């Protein structure tokens, strides 16, 4: 028999729902009513009767073994509010991308200006820019030429960026710097 392996990138995410009413395994717990008033330590039977009278559910909020906390509320409304909060948090997330500008030390002035203009657009959108200088052969030993290219590029974009990580050698033939938007 062949077994299928689970996808390593996307493992199954089973959302764990809070325990409700009879699912709660504690005999007594701290009960909080729908108005957030602490009713003290209550036995399970009494809490279930109270929940039925008020047509609400018992929901385990804090499953602490020594002091479990259960709240009296409408479970449907509670799950709806949780989903809505999760959706809102996801909508408010901002994703910062790192764009790369790769140049050679012998790049022409116009080409460097074009890359700087492109980088300014990315920075204004809130992205980070990784400036990479690739130097092959004898040019890789001429560090002053590599630093000059970076300085020229920085002079073109310095009004919108700040250097988060200065130009450093990431390998024998590659130098990189990280530029981020100015904090205003």
Curated annotation (Swiss-Prot):
Gene3D superfamilies (UniProt xref): Translation initiation factor 3 (IF-3), C-terminal domain, Translation initiation factor 3 (IF-3), N-terminal domain
Pfam families referenced in this protein's UniProt entry, alphabetically: IF3_C (PF00707), IF3_N (PF05198)
Coiled-coil intervals: none
Annotated protein name in UniProt: Translation initiation factor IF-3
Compartment annotation: Cytoplasm
InterPro entries per UniProt: T_IF-3_C_sf, T_IF-3_N_sf, Translation_initiation_fac3_CS, Translation_initiation_fac_3, Translation_initiation_fac_3_C, Translation_initiation_fac_3_N
Chief location: cytoplasm
Subunit structure: Monomer.
Any one Gene Ontology cellular component term annotated for this protein: cytosol
Keywords: Cytoplasm, Initiation factor, Protein biosynthesis
Keyword Protein transport among record annotations: no
Entry keyword Acetylation: no
Function: IF-3 binds to the 30S ribosomal subunit and shifts the equilibrium between 70S ribosomes and their 50S and 30S subunits in favor of the free subunits, thus enhancing the availability of 30S subunits on which protein synthesis initiation begins.
A biological-process GO annotation: ribosome disassembly
Species name: Mycoplasma genitalium (strain ATCC 33530 / DSM 19775 / NCTC 10195 / G37)
Record family assignment: Belongs to the IF-3 family.
Source lineage: Bacteria, Bacillati, Mycoplasmatota, Mycoplasmoidales, Mycoplasmoidaceae
GO molecular function: ribosome binding; translation initiation factor activity
């Amino acid at each position: 028999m062949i077994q299928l392996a689970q996808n390593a990138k996307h493992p199954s995410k089973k959302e764990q729902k809070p325990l409700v009413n009879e699912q709660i395994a504690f005999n007594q717990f701290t009960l909080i009513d729908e108005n957030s008033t602490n009713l003290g330590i209550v036995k399970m039977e009494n809490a279930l009767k109270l929940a039925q009278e008020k047509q609400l559910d018992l929901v385990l909020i804090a499953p602490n073994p020594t002091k479990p906390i259960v709240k009296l509320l409408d479970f449907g409304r509670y799950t709806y509010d949780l989903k809505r909060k999760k959706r809102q948090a996801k909508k408010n997330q901002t994703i910062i991308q790192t764009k790369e500008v790769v140049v050679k030390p012998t790049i022409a002035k116009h080409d460097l200006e074009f890359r700087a203009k492109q980088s300014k657009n990315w920075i204004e959108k809130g992205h980070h820019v990784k400036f990479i200088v690739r130097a092959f052969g004898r040019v890789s030993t001429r560090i002053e030429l590599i630093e000059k290219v970076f300085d020229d590029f920085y002079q073109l974009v310095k009004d919108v960026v700040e250097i988060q990580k200065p130009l450093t050698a990431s390998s024998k033939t590659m130098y990189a710097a990280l530029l981020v938007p100015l904090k205003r």
